[in-house]
Curated annotation (Swiss-Prot):
Compartments in which it is found: Cytoplasm
E.C. numbers: 1.1.1.94
Function description: Catalyzes the reduction of the glycolytic intermediate dihydroxyacetone phosphate (DHAP) to sn-glycerol 3-phosphate (G3P), the key precursor for phospholipid synthesis.
Cellular component terms (Gene Ontology): cytosol
Protein name, UniProt field: Glycerol-3-phosphate dehydrogenase [NAD(P)+]
UniProt cross-references to NCBIfam families, sorted A to Z: PRK00094.1-2, PRK00094.1-4
The keyword Lipid biosynthesis belongs to this UniProt entry's keyword annotation: yes
Keywords (A to Z) from UniProt: Cytoplasm, Lipid biosynthesis, Lipid metabolism, NAD, NADP, Nucleotide-binding, Oxidoreductase, Phospholipid biosynthesis, Phospholipid metabolism
GO process annotations (BP): carbohydrate metabolic process; glycerol-3-phosphate biosynthetic process; glycerol-3-phosphate catabolic process; glycerophospholipid metabolic process; phospholipid biosynthetic process
Top EC class of this enzyme: oxidoreductase
Family membership noted in the UniProt record: Belongs to the NAD-dependent glycerol-3-phosphate dehydrogenase family.
Length: 335
């Protein structure tokens, strides 16, 4: 028996994977702005563009009209999942507001800072929907393809609203997916943003053949950078040793399905950033938000040498091996 109505906004790899999981238990509607993609999904029961080879559940429905999708998740016992990238979150919030169809409860799954404003996702939502309160972030170590295949995964929903946490738990906590709850929205979002930048660093190190010792050092010292920035922005230190901090960092920094790690590997091989991004075909949020992370860190007086090295390679033309050498030349310090 289908137990609740859920609308998923965004039919990329992650939105499709989450919708596939939800549709096993719930009346789930997957929205995409591209009507041709919606028709293709309905006809093939497969998202060949973003998640090829994964059969989608027969009960999953598809929609190209945003108002219809939002109407599906209006009730107090429903849930809306925003699966757009950070760059599209603000526009979707405005569209919900302008349509006067803001869902009672919604969560977003994007990770990063808005490039031009340096806002975290919850700050964008608060600016666009100031009269709404029941929302939060769903995050954690997860690759879309594995979720779509029904492999085990653990995620965290963080929200100031108990009702939002309860709705999200009721929607997602079944099968091979385990959901934890909390209220440290800032900590969860900072972890999700910074780990993408750090994954580029580990990709560079692995691509240069620097070994597993170097990878371990980058992950642990990167975690220290993440925690320092997160605490400076109002997050709690313990959040960064959990799923959305250390867990997500380990996965993104070491997993072969990681787009950000792939960017680092290819930079180490001598490819230009423009060529890498053109060939990737998907979002690499670490590239998008690296400047914002470093800018905020400098503004707050937070030392983030690994992030600085990544930005030097991405944007200043510094050779990957020279950036690593710069890190090794840093003065010794207490841990």
């Amino acid at each position: 028996m289908l137990s609740m109505k859920v609308a998923v906004l965004g039919a990329g790899a992650w939105g499709t994977a989450l919708a596939a999981h939800l549709a096993v238990r719930h009346d789930t509607l997957l929205w995409a702005r591209d009507a041709a993609l919606v028709a293709e999904l309905a006809a093939r029961r497969e998202n060949a563009r973003y998640l090829g080879g994964v059969a989608l559940p027969p009960g999953l429905r598809y929609e190209a009209d945003l108002a219809t999708a939002l109407s599906h998740a209006q009730a107090d016992d429903a849930l809306c999942v925003i699966a757009a990238p950070v760059a599209g979150l603000r526009a979707l919030c405005r569209a919900m507001r302008d349509a006067r169809r803001v869902p009672a409860h919604f969560v977003w799954v994007c990770k990063g800072f808005e490039a031009d404003t340096r806002r975290l996702p919850h700050q964008m939502v608060a600016e666009e929907l100031p009269d709404h309160a029941s929302y939060g972030v769903l995050s954690g170590p997860s690759f879309a393809r594995e979720v779509a295949q029904g492999l085990p995964v653990a995620l965290t929903v963080a929200s100031a609203s108990a009702a939002c946490r309860e709705r999200t738990l009721a929607a997602f906590h079944h099968g091979a997916m385990r959901i934890y709850t909390g209220d440290d929205v800032v900590g969860v979002e900072v972890g999700g943003a910074v780990k993408n930048v750090l994954a580029i660093a580990t990709g560079i190190a692995d691509g240069l053949g620097l070994g597993l010792n170097a990878r371990a050092a980058l992950v642990t010292r990167g975690l220290a950078e993440m925690s320092r920035l997160g605490v400076a922005l109002g997050g709690r230190a313990e959040t960064f040793t959990g799923l959305t901090g250390l867990g997500d960092l380990i996965l993104t920094a070491t997993g072969d399905l990681s787009r950000n790690r792939s960017v680092g590997l290819q930079l180490a091989a001598g490819r230009s950033l423009d060529d890498i991004l053109a060939a990737l075909g998907h979002v690499a949020e670490g590239v998008r938000c690296a400047r914002a992370v470093l800018s905020i860190a400098r503004e707050r007086g937070v030392d983030m040498p690994i992030t600085e090295a990544v930005c030097a390679v991405l944007f200043d033309g510094v050779a990957p091996r020279d950036a690593v050498s710069g890190l090794l030349r840093r003065d010794a310090k207490a841990e």
